[in-house]
Amino acid sequence: MNNIIEYIESKYTPIAIIVYGSYCDGTNNESSDFDALVISDNHVKFHDLSFVDGVQLDLFIYPKEFFDKPDDFSDFMHIYYSDVVKDTNNYGENLKRNIVKYVDSLPNKTDVELLEGIAWCQKMLKRSKQNDIEGMFRWHWLLTESLSIFCQLKHKQYFGPKLQ
């Protein structure tokens, strides 16, 4: 991981590096990529998919200004479980704290909304039985969306398949 951090530091001059995913929770293996949010003073928004030492990067680079007045952290919920590995003036820790606060403040679904989610799953299951491309599409959509609906039924946020 040290070579990856050195690469990030030399290329983006980050003020914060926030690592999430398998390299954060210690479950990384030979097929893992390296997930990180990188905040930079001097770089535009960019998605870096380079390789370092055979590890594919999945770096989301953002200029600091992007987070100056955020009103919605929904695209950054995956940072909830993360490690700030480089930080200047507590910028990364403050950003993570704001994201955690945002996620923790999200309301649970109402009983009506939960029932709607179940009904949607039942409808998709029925429609997925079509023996055509639309049926296959609906089957895969059901498989992915039902994970989120299941977590909603348990009054939890869905952060991905590894974080439950």
Range-by-range predicted roles:
Residues 48-133:
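Conserved NTP/Mg2+-binding pocket subregion across the NTase superfamily
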Residues 1-31, 37-85:
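Metal-dependent nucleotidyltransferase catalytic core
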Residues 109-164:
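Conserved nucleotidyltransferase catalytic core and NTase-mimicking acidic/glycine-rich helix/loop elements
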Residues 1-3, 49, 71-73, 84-92, ...:
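Proteins with a high burden of low-complexity, intrinsically disordered sequence enriched in S/T/G/P/A and R
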